[in-house]
Amino acid sequence: MGLYLCIFDEDGEDICGVEVGLYNYFEEFRCLISKYTNKGLASKILKRKSRFTLPMTTLLNHSDCDGSWNVDECVQLKMELQEIKQVFMNELPDLSIIELKQDIFKFYGIKPENLFECFIDSDCEFRIDRLLELCDLAIQENRSMMFQ
């Protein structure tokens, strides 16, 4: 079963949505971001600094199985995603992610050149870009982003 993030209009019609992919793909995306924030015990012991200036709490602290991000949270989420994109575009691809998704990458002929390109949605579009577009629409339409 996969995660679908979407925006509904006032009549409950789906305006736009993103098939994020399997729940475990979204979870590994968030786990990697968490590693880059260096909030784990090992990072504290080794005194590693976060590669992000933002704490990434909007993305990391929300359950992925239910609920929504309201418009204010979408504004914050957009800032987080912009920073994630900037950092990930300058990082090497993660071999464990490539291995996890090797069938998808092979099918679509994708060879990620950086960490940003390791994350695609079910339509083979870059996940972070699609989430940024969804944030923009939620803000523009003054609608929450729903987890389905």
Placement of each model-derived feature along the sequence:
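Acidic (Asp/Glu-rich) sequence patches and key acidic residues
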Residues: 1-133, 137-148
